[in-house]
Amino acid sequence: MTGRGKGGKGLGKGGAKRHRKVLRDNIQGITKPAIRRLARRGGVKRISSLIYEETRGVLKVFLENVIRDAVTYTEHAKIPTVTAMDVVYALKRQGRTLYGFGG
């Protein structure tokens, strides 16, 4: 055993994957009912059919900006994993302070 504790197999310690799944159309995973639930939480009663695609586009841009900033913090710290604090700092930098995740 090479110092891996009781796990034995050493899962997650392998090399690069041979076949990486191509990521496309994942934005469609934000379903119509999910957008409807978010709108309901915001106090919306009736929703136009054009809203769903528009919401997906806005959400995609927002997440791209937050993730870009969070990854920048992670790379600066020279660590391989994006932490919750990286995301908190990225949101704070964009003027959207988030409480409850440390710091």
UniProtKB/Swiss-Prot annotation:
Function of the molecule: Core component of nucleosome. Nucleosomes wrap and compact DNA into chromatin, limiting DNA accessibility to the cellular machineries which require DNA as a template. Histones thereby play a central role in transcription regulation, DNA repair, DNA replication and chromosomal stability. DNA accessibility is regulated via a complex set of post-translational modifications of histones, also called histone code, and nucleosome remodeling.
CDD domains: HFD_H4
Family per similarity comment: Belongs to the histone H4 family.
Composition bias, Gly residues: 1-14
Cellular component GO terms held in the UniProt record: nucleosome; nucleus
Known DNA-binding region: 17-21
Alphabetized InterPro entries for the sequence: Histone-fold, Histone_H4, Histone_H4_CS
Keyword set includes GTP-binding: no
Any GO MF annotation of the entry: protein heterodimerization activity
UniProt keywords, alphabetically: Acetylation, Chromosome, DNA-binding, Methylation, Nucleosome core, Nucleus
Location(s), subcellular: Nucleus; Chromosome
Protein name: Histone H4
Subunit-structure text: The nucleosome is a histone octamer containing two molecules each of H2A, H2B, H3 and H4 assembled in one H3-H4 heterotetramer and two H2A-H2B heterodimers. The octamer wraps approximately 147 bp of DNA.
PANTHER family on file: HISTONE H4
